């Protein structure tokens, strides 16, 4: 993973922003009216973040980025479905974004709810369905079940994206696309890259 960090300028830019955030040395880049004006002709974000809808994990804040920098897809439990894959494919294939980060986080309430086997209301059983593979992978592991499911889900979602995104396998083979699993620690603000 260190090799990717060293060689990937976009990932380095993300992680440097996260370091500033952790140290409370935010520079709030690209948030001026000039930047807004500059973007009226189009967007060229340098990274895609697939993250959870949790109010404590807003990518622009935790990576200290601004307008037009990040293409963000947020959904409870950072799971995948067809529209989410389509959203990511749009950014890769039409906006030429070459880095995808799949970011889970500590204390994910959505995963917790699924692990507790609560009778879930409304459309929430579809979340359980989306997390089922991670739940199966993690259920016999030692340690905290919720944390294990969060980690398993990030890995499985990254793998699924690698395999199912249109043109993603060949792009990755040619080094034109990088998909990075990551885990955000709510208490410290650190984004940890997972291998
Ligand atoms: Zn969450």
Predicted feature residues:
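Conserved functional hotspot residues or short segments at active or partner-binding sites
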Residues: 102
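Short helix-loop-beta junction
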Residues: 64-72
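Short glycine-enriched loops at secondary-structure junctions
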Residues: 51-56, 76-79, 105
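Acidic/His- and Gly-rich active-site-bordering loop/insert found
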Residues: 59
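Short glycine-rich or small-residue beta-strand-to-loop segments that form or flank ligand, phosphate
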Residues: 48, 71-74
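An anion-binding catalytic pocket shared by soluble metabolic enzymes
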Residues: 55, 63-64
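Short acidic/polar active-site loop segments enriched in Thr and Asp
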Residues: 98
């Amino acid at each position: 993973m260190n090799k990717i960090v060293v060689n990937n300028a976009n990932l380095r830019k993300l992680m440097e922003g996260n370091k500033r955030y952790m140290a409370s040395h935010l520079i709030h880049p690209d948030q001026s009216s000039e930047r807004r004006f500059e973007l009226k002709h189009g967007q060229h974000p340098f990274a895609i973040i697939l993250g959870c809808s949790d109010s404590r994990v807003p990518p622009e804040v935790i990576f200290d980025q601004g307008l037009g920098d990040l293409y963000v897809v947020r959904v409870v439990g950072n799971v995948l479905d067809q529209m989410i894959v389509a959203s990511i494919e749009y950014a890769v294939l039409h906006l030429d974004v070459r880095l995808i980060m799949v970011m889970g986080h500590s204390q994910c309430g959505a995963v917790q709810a699924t692990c507790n086997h609560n009778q879930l209301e409304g459309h929430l059983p579809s979340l359980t369905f989306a997390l089922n593979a991670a739940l199966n992978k993690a259920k016999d592991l030692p340690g905290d079940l919720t944390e294990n499911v969060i980690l398993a889900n990030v890995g499985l979602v990254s793998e699924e994206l690698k395999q199912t995104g249109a043109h993603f396998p060949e792009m990755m083979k040619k080094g034109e696309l990088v998909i990075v699993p990551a885990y955000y620690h709510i208490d410290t603000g650190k984004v940890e890259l997972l291998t």
